[in-house]
C-alpha cells in the first residue's frame, strides 16, 4: 500500500500537487472552483456600488446593493461548500500523499545521513590505515638503524681487538729480537774459545804470526 502512493509521487499527474509553485497552486484552485472567485468579485462590486450610492445620498440603491452584497456572499459560501464536498475525496488523497511525501523526504534525509556516516567511517578507516602504515614504516626504519648501528659498533670493536692483538704481537716480537741478538752474539765467542782448545779455527792463532814478523824484524836489524 505504501508503494503505490510513492509511485504516484514520482509518476502521473499527482506529482503536480507537490512540485507546483504558489502561483500554479492558485491557478489550479481557480480552475477547480471557479464559482468562489466569481462570488467574491460580485460581493466586492455590490459593496463598492453601495458606498457610491451612500455618497450620492441614494438610499434606495444603497439598500439594493447591500442586499446584492449579501446574496453574493451567500453564493460564495455555497460555492465553497459545494466545491469542498465535490473535491473532498481528492483533498483527502492529497493529504495522504502529502504525509507520504513527508515520510519519503524524511527517509531520503535518513538515507543521506547514513551514507554520509558511512563515507566518514570509510575516510576514518583509510586515515587509520595510512597512519598504521606510516607507524610501521617508521618502526622498521628505526629497527634498521639500530641494527646498522649495532653492526657498525661490532665491526669497530672487532677492528679494535684486531689492532690490539697486532700491537701485542708486535711488542712481543720487539722484546724477543734483542734477546735473540744477544744469544747470537754470545754463541760465536764460546765456539771460538772452545775452538782454541780443541784445535778449531779462531782468531787467537793469529798471534804467532805477529811473533814471527817480530822475529824477522829483529833478525834484519841484527844483520
From Swiss-Prot:
Residues 121-132, 159-188, 208-223 have a biased composition (Basic and acidic residues). Cytochrome c oxidase subunit which plays a role in assembly of respiratory supercomplexes. Residues 87-139 form a coiled coil. Residues 121-223 are annotated as: Disordered. Disulfide bonds: none annotated. It comes from the Eukaryota. Pfam families: HIG_1_N. GO terms for cellular component: mitochondrial membrane. Belongs to the RCF1 family. Its main location: mitochondrion. One of its GO terms (biological process) is mitochondrial respirasome assembly. Associates with the respiratory chain complex III/complex IV supercomplex. It is found in: Mitochondrion membrane. Gene3D superfamilies: 6.10.140.1320. The chain crosses the membrane at residues 34-53, 66-88. It is a multi-pass membrane protein. Signal peptide: none annotated. Keywords: Coiled coil, Membrane, Mitochondrion, Transmembrane, Transmembrane helix. This is Respiratory supercomplex factor 1, mitochondrial. Residues 7-98 form the HIG1 domain.
Amino acid at each position: 500500500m505504501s508503494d503505490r502512493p510513492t509511485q504516484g509521487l514520482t509518476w502521473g499527474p499527482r506529482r503536480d500537487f507537490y512540485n507546483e509553485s504558489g502561483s500554479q497552486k492558485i491557478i489550479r484552485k481557480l480552475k477547480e472552483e471557479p464559482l468562489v472567485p466569481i462570488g467574491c468579485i460580485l460581493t466586492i462590486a455590490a459593496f463598492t456600488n453601495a458606498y457610491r450610492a451612500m455618497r450620492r445620498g441614494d438610499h434606495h440603491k444603497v439598500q439594493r446593493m447591500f442586499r446584492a452584497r449579501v446574496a453574493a456572499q451567500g453564493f460564495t459560501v455555497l460555492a465553497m461548500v459545494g466545491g469542498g464536498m465535490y473535491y473532498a475525496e481528492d483533498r483527502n488523497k492529497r493529504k495522504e500523499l502529502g504525509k507520504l511525501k513527508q515520510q519519503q523526504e524524511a527517509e531520503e534525509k535518513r538515507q543521506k545521513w547514513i551514507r554520509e556516516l558511512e563515507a566518514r567511517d570509510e575516510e576514518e578507516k583509510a586515515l587509520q590505515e595510512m597512519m598504521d602504515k606510516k607507524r610501521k614504516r617508521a618502526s622498521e626504519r628505526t629497527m634498521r638503524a639500530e641494527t646498522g648501528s649495532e653492526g657498525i659498533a661490532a665491526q669497530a670493536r672487532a677492528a679494535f681487538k684486531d689492532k690490539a692483538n697486532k700491537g701485542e704481537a708486535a711488542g712481543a716480537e720487539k722484546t724477543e729480537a734483542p734477546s735473540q741478538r744477544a744469544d747470537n752474539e754470545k754463541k760465536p765467542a764460546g765456539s771460538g774459545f772452545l775452538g782454541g782448545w780443541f784445535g778449531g779455527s779462531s782468531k787467537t792463532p793469529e798471534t804467532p804470526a805477529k811473533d814471527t814478523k817480530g822475529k824477522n824484524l829483529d833478525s834484519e836489524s841484527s844483520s
